[in-house]
């Protein structure tokens, strides 16, 4: 019981930089930046980072870094709440509170990305379009079907539930609000 050892993994700065940069780029698809097309490409590195690593801890930490960068960029408007004179917090303290709210909500929303990576990284996925039997006679399900379903259920539905204090402002579908043809085809 006392022989606990922290999981070891090799620190790879390039993977962390990719996670943070791609999360920030995905955040630029938010309304206000109007770079809607970035949402179609910026999430692919997240899936690759999850499946390119064998360490479970590293998978969820990279997903958390991606989610944090995504939410920090997407929720940039929190900084416009300052100065908080209307709440009685003047000067630098109002700016500090706005920044604290921005960071804390971004961290909280990044937890949905961590949960997504924690669940999806354990699923037996295949790159084919149909389910097939893999090694050890385990059925591999197509990633093209499972990943979108998992994203909607975990990040959109569970991560944004008001009961869990989720905020629905960073939902991926909001990035496409000026693309009615894309929305109608879904």
Question: Where are the regions a protein language model picked out?
Answer:
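Membrane-embedded alpha-helical bundles of multi-pass enzymes
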Residues: 1-186
């Amino acid at each position: 019981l006392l022989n606990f050892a922290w999981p070891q993994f090799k620190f790879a700065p390039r993977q962390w930089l990719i996670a943070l940069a791609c999360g920030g780029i995905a955040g630029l698809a938010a309304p206000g930046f109007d770079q809607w097309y970035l949402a179609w490409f910026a999430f692919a590195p997240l899936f690759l980072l999850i499946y390119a690593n064998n360490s479970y801890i590293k998978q969820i930490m990279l997903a958390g870094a991606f989610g944090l960068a995504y939410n920090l960029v997407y929720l940039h408007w929190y900084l416009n709440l300052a100065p908080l004179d209307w709440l009685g917090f003047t000067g630098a303290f109002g700016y500090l509170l706005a920044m604290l709210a921005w960071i804390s909500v971004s961290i909280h929303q990044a937890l949905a990305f961590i949960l997504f990576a924690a669940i999806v990284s354990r699923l037996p996925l295949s790159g084919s379009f149909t389910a097939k039997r893999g090694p050890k006679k385990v059925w591999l399900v197509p990633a093209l079907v499972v990943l979108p379903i998992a994203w909607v259920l975990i990040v959109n539905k569970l991560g944004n539930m008001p009961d869990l204090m989720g905020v629905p402002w960073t939902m991926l579908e909001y990035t496409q609000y000026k693309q009615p043809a894309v929305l109608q085809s879904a």
